[in-house]
């Protein structure tokens, strides 16, 4: 039976060959010949070799110009013209040998040179030494780390907290710990560089909405909702995150958190709140933007902040529910693979928290000074104030750009230099121009601290006004 079947198949093939159109047979024949040629032909052809004479070799060597090891850099680049600070960057700072009032460092609560903080750090140094020489999971966890995490969780009124040894890596590690490829992140276009690096590491689908524009965010959420309805199976495994800052580093503006919380529950998203600038600043007790708006901490899925501003230490922390925070102990890259925070800095942060809890009036003092400098800087010729009146970090931008970013930077730097000559230390906001997703305009950053007196605030405002008139008019 098998032989008969094989003969029948052969007969059908021959019959099909006779019935096939001529062009079909020609095409198949060409393809067969092409395949045979590809199989037996060589992948390359040997070219006739032509040896160069010694004279020709020497001429080629003399003509050859090597590429520079590094790209050419302008002599006016800020990295090549840095200021040298002598001593701690406290209320009064010595820059290039000249003593100035510090309006550049983020020492909001003036704790950097606080005697209690320094004494605690010295005591911890004698007990633990300088560093830990290992990550938290490899003999890098000291009792003072656990104490600090407990204190931070208690202060923020959350279940648990986790600390990182570097402020920048905190949010940059937290985002990719939860959001992976295939997930969707809705992020404010003015997000700081640390958030941008976290987004990049997550490999998630990033959707930017206009700065503090709740309507634009809802538009994106609605579009995603429509997409989810088309593919409900995929939607069930896709996580959605909203990433914002409490006070934006690049603009000094506050996020509309109440409206964001409403959108969170309406569209079933999770909120990550970066509070490096608002922690220790906003709220009656310095707990940040949630306390400022009176929003329950449970409405926020994860809060992140660094300890390098208000706490005048180093590192950062995340806080929230225990099951959320514990996930970072296994998935937070900066937590798992970096040496843990030096114990002396953890002890200093604990003492800074003690001072914040003992002196809650300090936040009202800072708020008043922020409002005063914000008001005093209004109407400066050629400059506009960008930022909320309650933000301790304001931006001064040119009212009208020259059309060239390089020229704008030079004009603002001339104002900074004149202020420095008159004893007011300021700085321009610096960015990695080629790596920023949405590059902010050039600006001068003015930082307010509780240590600055009213007379110094007014002096700074008048000095900036005079420098702007001299440079821009």
Swiss-Prot record:
Keywords: Acyltransferase, Endoplasmic reticulum, Lipid metabolism, Membrane, Phosphoprotein, Pyridoxal phosphate, Sphingolipid metabolism, Transferase, Transmembrane, Transmembrane helix. Induction: Expression levels at protein level increase upon high-fat diet. mRNA levels remain unchanged. Residues 1-66 are annotated as: Interaction with SPTLC2. The lineage of its organism: Eukaryota, Metazoa, Chordata, Craniata, Vertebrata. Component of the serine palmitoyltransferase multisubunit enzyme (SPT) that catalyzes the initial and rate-limiting step in sphingolipid biosynthesis by condensing L-serine and activated acyl-CoA (most commonly palmitoyl-CoA) to form long-chain bases. The SPT complex is also composed of SPTLC2 or SPTLC3 and SPTSSA or SPTSSB. Within this complex, the heterodimer with SPTLC2 or SPTLC3 forms the catalytic core. The composition of the serine palmitoyltransferase (SPT) complex determines the substrate preference. The chain crosses the membrane at residues 16-36. It is a single-pass membrane protein. It is found in: Endoplasmic reticulum membrane. PANTHER family: CLASS II AMINOTRANSFERASE/8-AMINO-7-OXONONANOATE SYNTHASE, SERINE PALMITOYLTRANSFERASE 1. The keyword Phosphoprotein applies. Phosphorylation at Tyr-164 inhibits activity and promotes cell survival. Its main location: endoplasmic reticulum. It is an enzyme of class 2 (transferase). The transmembrane domain is involved in the interaction with ORMDL3. This is Serine palmitoyltransferase 1. It holds the Pfam family Aminotran_1_2. The gene is Sptlc1. SPT complex catalytic activity is negatively regulated by ORMDL proteins, including ORMDL3, in the presence of ceramides. This mechanism allows to maintain ceramide levels at sufficient concentrations for the production of complex sphingolipids, but which prevents the accumulation of ceramides to levels that trigger apoptosis.
């Amino acid at each position: 039976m098998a032989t008969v079947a094989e003969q029948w198949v052969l007969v059908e093939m021959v019959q099909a060959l006779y019935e096939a159109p001529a062009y079909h047979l020609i095409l198949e024949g060409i393809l067969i010949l092409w395949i045979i040629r590809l199989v037996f032909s060589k992948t390359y052809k040997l070219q006739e070799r032509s040896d160069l004479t010694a004279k020709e070799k020497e001429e080629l060597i003399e003509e050859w110009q090597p590429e520079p090891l590094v790209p050419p850099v302008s002599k006016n680049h800020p990295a090549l013209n840095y200021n040298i600070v002598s001593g701690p960057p406290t209320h009064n700072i010595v820059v290039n040998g000249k003593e100035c009032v510090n309006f550049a460092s983020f020492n909001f609560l003036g704790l950097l040179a606080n005697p209690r903080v320094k004494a605690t750090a010295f005591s911890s140094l004698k007990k633990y030494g300088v560093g830990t020489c290992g990550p938290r999971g490899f003999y890098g966890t000291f009792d003072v780390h656990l104490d600090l995490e407990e204190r931070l969780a208690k202060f923020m009124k959350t279940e648990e907290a986790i600390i990182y040894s570097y402020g920048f890596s905190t949010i940059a590690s937290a985002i990719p710990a939860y959001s992976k490829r295939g997930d969707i992140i809705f992020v404010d276009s003015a997000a700081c560089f640390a958030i941008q690096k976290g987004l990049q590491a997550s490999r998630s689908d990033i959707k930017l909405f206009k700065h503090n524009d709740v309507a634009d965010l809802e538009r994106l959420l609605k579009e995603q909702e429509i997409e989810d309805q088309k593919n409900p199976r995929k939607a069930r495994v896709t996580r959605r995150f909203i990433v914002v800052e409490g006070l934006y580093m690049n603009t000094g503006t506050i996020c509309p958190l109440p409206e964001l919380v409403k959108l969170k529950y309406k569209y079933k998203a999770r909120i990550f709140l970066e509070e490096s600038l608002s922690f220790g600043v906003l709220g009656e007790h310095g707990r940040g933007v949630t306390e400022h708006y009176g929003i329950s901490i449970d409405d926020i899925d994860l809060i992140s902040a660094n300890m390098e501003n208000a706490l005048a230490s180093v590192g950062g922390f995340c806080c929230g529910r225990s099951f959320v925070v514990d996930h970072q102990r296994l998935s937070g890259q900066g937590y798992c693979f970096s040496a843990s925070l030096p114990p002396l800095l953890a002890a200093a942060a604990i003492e800074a928290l003690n001072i914040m809890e003992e002196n809650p009036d300090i936040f009202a003092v800072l708020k008043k000074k922020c409002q005063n400098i914000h008001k005093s800087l209004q109407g400066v010729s050629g400059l506009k104030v960008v930022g909320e009146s309650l933000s301790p970090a304001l931006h001064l931008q040119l009212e009208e750009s020259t059309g060239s970013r390089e020229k704008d930077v030079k004009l603002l730097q001339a104002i900074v230099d004149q202020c420095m000559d008159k004893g007011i230390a300021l700085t321009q906001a610096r960015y990695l121009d080629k790596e920023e997703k949405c590059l902010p305009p050039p600006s001068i950053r003015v930082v307010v601290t509780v240590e600055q007196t009213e007379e110094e605030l007014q002096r700074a405002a008048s000095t900036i006004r005079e420098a702007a008139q001299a440079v821009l008019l």
